[in-house]
């Protein structure tokens, strides 16, 4: 029941995805060949959320791996869990998108999309009751952004009532991987606003900061960053996979976190994060976790929650703890920091408790927040977009693939609208809410 199909698009998506499968397989006691080696019935009880059982009791991930060049696929296959995936679920082109959104969305990607949809439908048909799709991709490149958004809109057509959840790696402010990032990101956000139900925004720079500051790693690698992300991804779905006192699923998350349909871009955090050396000096308790969870340094985006206000938030606790204590702490946070929470949504933190903690921890918590400060990120990308678009820099790469300048203008204005919507709800007070209604009546 409640299966999730995981789609990984582009290099970034596949690398995060393969790390994620390592974490999930470890939690469920599945070894790299797909055989169950665990010691607890709880691991098997709902293993079918992410795994399909094949002949001979072998567990196969419900995963679709897409890329427009074969390179990443080879490194996934060569990785520790490379042999666990179904070979038919690797779908790749030969040419690569070359960091070009138009190639991923209109030319190269469009040629592959039918075979990708076939595999996705096969995976969906083997499910009892499909909960939704989870898509890992980056917005700065060509494949993850262009082809990823194309796939999302196609899946939306076929499965209109299923949850579409994306884990989107947003370009970071100081570190840029490609020059045309602002173009690719803006065009992607334009699609995500319309077609996804929940988008978790993650950015590399914030992840680097967490590794460097909190975990005290001197030279963090992409492997370390991806491990952080996969801890959160597994935390979001742990209620589906293990028994809990207070369950949540993707749909409950969406219902509780999205007050207005367009504002579905979330920040994520994870606690406890401590460096190896100082682990034994810290106690794990619900107050301690709550404190770290709301800490700005723990957020996986380069946006400061103190600059905005929380529309809604969700805390997914894992481990043995009293639900009473969880409720008290959540109430406590809201009362003490009431200025950072929107006052016209009372009780805006959803909490859930799952009994099984992650491997090697007694308790942990995953945090998902819908904060208006995420507009900083879109605003930053929008400014970079405008600077380049005003001079029409690099545009010929996109128009050459059949795109129109009009599309760029549309995407830009859609993203600017998103920013101003966030700003509007950040400034709104209870008194003003009444005025909005009155204006509509005349």
UniProtKB/Swiss-Prot annotation:
Cofactor(s) essential for the protein: Mg(2+)
UniProt binding sites for GTP: 11, 69, 138, 142-144, 204, 226
Gene Ontology CC: cytoplasm; microtubule
Residue sites binding Mg(2+) per the record: 69
Location of the protein in the cell: Cytoplasm, Cytoskeleton
GO biological process, one term: microtubule-based process
One term of GO molecular function: metal ion binding
One Pfam assignment: Tubulin_C
InterPro entries: Beta-tubulin_BS, Beta_tubulin, Tub_FtsZ_C, Tubulin, Tubulin/FtsZ-like_C, Tubulin/FtsZ_2-layer-sand-dom, Tubulin/FtsZ_GTPase_sf, Tubulin_C
Role description: Tubulin is the major constituent of microtubules, a cylinder consisting of laterally associated linear protofilaments composed of alpha- and beta-tubulin heterodimers. Microtubules grow by the addition of GTP-tubulin dimers to the microtubule end, where a stabilizing cap forms. Below the cap, tubulin dimers are in GDP-bound state, owing to GTPase activity of alpha-tubulin.
Family: Belongs to the tubulin family.
Protein name according to UniProt: Tubulin beta chain
Organism encoding this protein: Trypanosoma brucei rhodesiense
Lineage: Eukaryota, Discoba, Euglenozoa, Kinetoplastea, Metakinetoplastina
